[in-house]
Every structure is written in C-alpha cells, then in structure tokens.
C-alpha cells in the first residue's frame, strides 16, 4: 500500500532498471538528433530556456532548419529511387534495414562528436548525470506578474515522427532482450507502450524479512494517520533496527512522531543525529559498479544539500525563536551572547557554508541571514527596556550598539549572497523594514529618554529660574516652550522680552 523503505538489489530488478534507462537514453538521443537539439543540456524544456532568443540564435536556428529540410529532401529522393528500382525489378543492396543500420552507425559516430561518455556502461548513471538536482526536472511557471510571463516550450509531434523515433531504439533493444527472462520482457513491453504494471516490486517478494518490512510500513502509516503516536513510535523503533531499511526514507515520519510523542526526546535531536551520520562529505567512487544508487535528494551529495539538513536548520531556528520570545521573565534577565542556542546555531552554519554543497545553496544563506536577523532583534530589544533596568550606560551601551550594527550588516551581506545564488525568493522589502526598526530602537529611544529627562528637570525647578534655563528648553522642545509662554504672567513676559533683547545685543 505504501512505499517500502528498502532498495531491492537482486538481479531481476537490476536488469529491469537497466532496460528502462537504456531505452530512455536511446529515445532521448534519437529525439535530439531528429529535432536538431544539443544533447549537452542538463534540464528539461522550461519556460526559462524557451524565452525569445536573440537575432544570432534565430539565424542559427534558421541555418539548422535549412540543413534539416535538405536532409529530408535527400531521404525522399532515395526512397523514390528505391521504389522505382523495385518496380523495374532491379536488385539493389540499399534496403530499408541497411539504411537504418547506416543511420545507426552515423548516430554512434556522432556520439563521439557530442561528447557522450562511452566508457560509462551504467545506463542509470548516464541518465542521472543530466539531472544533478531534482528541481532541474520540474518546469517553472511564472504567472505572478504579467512582465515575467514567458511562452512555454511546447513541441508537437505527429504519429509518423514518433514511430520514426521509436523504430531504431526498439531495434537496438532486441539484443539486450535476448538475454532477459520472459517476465522482464513483458515488463519492458508494457513500459515501452506507456503502460504501468499492476504488480509492484515489493508485492512479488516472498522473502520473510521483506514481507515483515512491508507489513510494518503499512501499520506505521495507519497509526500515524490515526494519531496513535505511542504505537507508531514502537513500530518506528522496530523498523529502523531491521537490516536493509533505509532510515533516509523514514526520517520525515520519524520526526513527526517524536514531536507529537509526550515524554520523549525532540525530533531536533534526531535530525542532528542524521546530519552527523549521513554527511555530504562522503566520496562517491566512480569506478565501483554500485548495484543500487540512492537518489541524491535523500542522501545529499557535493552538489545537492540533503533535505534533512535543511529541515534541521529551519527547526533549530524556530526553536531558538521560541526560546527568545519577549516576556517579563526573559527581559529582566541579563542577555548572554556566548552560551545561548542561537549563537551555537550561527557558529554551526558558519562552518557549513565553508564547504560544498552548503556554500552554493541559497536557502542555507537565507537561514544564515535569518539567524543574524533574530540576533539583532534580541540585542536591540534591550534598548527598549533600558529606562526600566538602567543597565546600558557608558561603554557598555556603545558595545551593544556596535553589536547590533554588526549583525544588521551581516543580514544585508548574506541576503545579497542568497540573491546572487538564485533559485530562492526573499522578502527583501519586509526584511529591510525590520532592519530599520532595529536601528530606530538604538537612537530613537535614546532621544525620547533625553527629552523626558529635560522635562522632569524643568518641572522640579520654580518659576524664578525659568528665564535662566529658558533657552535650553527652547532648543530641546519648541512645543513645550509655547505652552509655557501661555501660562506666564505679564511681568514674566516683560522679563522674557528683556531676555531676548540682551541676546540680540550680544550677537
């Protein structure tokens, strides 16, 4: 019922995968040859690479179209000659099969020119070399803005062209099918015609261990859907201890169980253990013929970040944000910048971005910038409550201000790196507004405190000393000055006019 977290490595399934990928490679190569497209592309047709080309590219396409039309005319001419020779009764050697074989020879000769690796005999590895990352096999639909809309690279094919493309790959597959079993022949015939076999790879297995794994997998998903977390945890703990089970296929449901199970360790510890055990630094030896290749989006590679590593970074950031939520108990405590969880996460990411694949992943750089954003928010929040605590004064205050400015600078720098890497959308305007609010906490709140201190000093003195400090009050707050002028008596107004006249004479 559900996907089984094992990889069957017996000879029958290895032969099935070889036949499937070999046929796909033949079809792709023949299609690229007929459609006059380069075989060096590493992605499927997407709206990005189907935009309007320049004039040079259009001229190149016109020249390629001209050569294609000439080749079609030559084929029609040869076909017409064969027809009239057969009508006359002349025996000729250029039969259809021989012409097809000549096309195959020219196609094989063209492989050396296009740079196809002939030494690599693994058809599955040939196929996945074109798709280093899973997202390259998806189409990108730009429908948010009318300016970013691009035409989809649609290609129509007639039934005649399809049969022409399919003829030579099927003929090439006759020799590999001679050494296959009858079951694998039926499997190949079904997938080549676009059919899907009803029997899965695990439904035919009669091994006791595999049958137990299939049963436990079904029970695990059923109990998770019913929110029976205690029983699901027992099944998960039993399943990951069976030899042959790939934990990399079960980590998602395992984290969900650990997060919802009471009186147990958090799923964050499990993700941290996954990052330590399944490191992306492990080297893949090309000379070894691996019978089963695990997809890179499960294990991670030097060009692709593992999904559980990204999930671990996001979960750690959310955990740090929850532990630093503003409350009366947290604000009154002194802030420790060396031993908190957020600083540990920043140090960990700073080590990760020095090595591939993290240094080329835009999402990792965005998480790195988000950590410094949270750090700047936490440090700048101390200035809001400075009037209550009176802790930040003198040199200590200047140090805290420099720390906030440093983290704000890191946020802008890492966001720029994230945008340069591409492939990740960033709310730049929202983040910039938050950074400006952090800066306003440093200076805007200090100015308000200074104004309040001046107002308190003026309230504490008597009216006889108003004219002595009148100029200082005027320079600080003009509105406060106007209200006091309205309350002064006529005698005080006369003294005030004498005060201004003395200032003008001194100037």
Curated annotation (Swiss-Prot):
Keyword Transcription attributed: yes
Region of interest: Disordered: 37-76, 89-124
Highest taxon of source: Eukaryota
A GO term for molecular function: RNA polymerase I core promoter sequence-specific DNA binding
Protein localization: Nucleus, Nucleolus
Disulfide bonds listed in the record: none
One BP annotation, GO: nucleolar large rRNA transcription by RNA polymerase I
Ranges of compositional bias, category Basic and acidic residues: 109-124
Principal location: nucleus
Residue ranges with Acidic residues bias: 97-108
GO cellular component, one term: nucleolus
Keywords: Nucleus, Transcription, Transcription regulation
Bias (Polar residues): 37-47
Function: Acts as a component of the core factor (CF) complex which is essential for the initiation of rDNA transcription by RNA polymerase I. After binding of UAF (upstream activation factor) to an upstream element of the promoter, CF is recruited in a SPT15/TBP-dependent manner to form a preinitiation complex.
SUBUNIT field: Component of the core factor (CF) complex, which consists of RRN6, RRN7 and RRN11. The CF heterotrimer may further dimerize to form a hexamer. RRN11 interacts with RRN6, RRN7 and SPT15.
Other noteworthy facts: Present with 476 molecules/cell in log phase SD medium.
Official protein name in the record: RNA polymerase I-specific transcription initiation factor RRN11
Source organism of this protein record: Saccharomyces cerevisiae (strain ATCC 204508 / S288c) (Baker's yeast)
Gene for this chain: RRN11
């Amino acid at each position: 019922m559900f996907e089984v977290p094992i990889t069957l490595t017996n000879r029958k399934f290895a032969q099935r995968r070889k036949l499937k990928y070999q046929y796909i490679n033949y079809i792709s190569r023949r299609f690229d040859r007929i459609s006059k497209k380069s075989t060096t592309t590493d992605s499927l047709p997407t709206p990005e690479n189907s935009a309007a080309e320049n004039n040079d590219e259009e001229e190149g396409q016109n020249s390629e179209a001209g050569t294609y039309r000439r080749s079609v005319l030559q084929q029609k001419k040869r076909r017409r000659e064969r027809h009239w020779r057969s009508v006359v009764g002349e025996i000729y050697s250029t039969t259809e099969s021989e012409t097809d074989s000549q096309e195959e020879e020219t196609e094989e000769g063209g492989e050396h020119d296009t740079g196809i690796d002939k030494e690599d005999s693994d058809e599955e590895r040939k196929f996945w070399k074109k798709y280093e990352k899973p997202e390259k096999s998806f189409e990108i639909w730009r429908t948010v803005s009318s300016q970013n809309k691009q035409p989809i690279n649609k290609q129509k094919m007639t039934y005649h062209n399809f049969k022409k493309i399919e003829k030579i790959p099927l003929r090439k597959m006759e020799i590999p099918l001679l050494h296959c079993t009858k079951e694998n022949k039926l499997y190949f015939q079904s997938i080549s015609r676009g059919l899907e076999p009803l029997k899965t790879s695990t439904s035919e297995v009669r091994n006791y261990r595999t049958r137990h794994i299939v049963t436990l997998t079904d029970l695990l998903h059923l109990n998770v859907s019913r929110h029976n977390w205690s029983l699901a945890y027992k099944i998960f703990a039993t399943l990951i201890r069976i030899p042959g089970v790939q934990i990399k296929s079960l980590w998602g449901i395992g984290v969900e169980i650990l997060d919802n199970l009471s009186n147990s360790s958090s799923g964050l510890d499990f993700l941290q253990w996954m990052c330590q055990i399944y490191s992306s630094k492990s080297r893949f030896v090309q000379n070894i013929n691996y019978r089963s290749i695990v997809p890179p989006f499960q294990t991670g590679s030097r060009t692709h970040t593992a999904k559980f590593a990204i999930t671990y970074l996001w979960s750690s950031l959310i955990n740090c944000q929850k532990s630093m939520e503003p409350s009366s108990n947290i604000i009154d405590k002194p802030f420790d910048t060396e031993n908190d969880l957020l600083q540990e996460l920043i140090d960990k990411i700073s080590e990760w971005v020095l090595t591939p694949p993290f240094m080329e992943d835009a999402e990792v750089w965005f998480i790195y910038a988000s950590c410094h954003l949270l750090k700047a928010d936490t440090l700048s929040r101390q200035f809001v409550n400075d009037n209550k605590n009176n802790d930040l004064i003198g040199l200590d205050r200047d140090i805290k201000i420099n720390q906030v400015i440093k983290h704000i600078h890191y946020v802008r720098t890492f966001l720029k790196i994230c945008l340069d890497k591409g492939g990740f959308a960033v709310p730049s305007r929202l983040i910039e507004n938050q950074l400006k609010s952090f800066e306003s906490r440093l200076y805007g709140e200090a100015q308000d405190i200074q104004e309040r201190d001046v107002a308190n000093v003026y309230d504490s003195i008597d009216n006889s000393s108003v004219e002595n400090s009148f100029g200082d009050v005027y320079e600080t707050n003009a509105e406060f000055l106007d209200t006091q002028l309205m309350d002064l008596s006529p005698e005080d107004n006369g003294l005030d006019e004498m005060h201004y006249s003395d200032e003008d004479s001194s100037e």
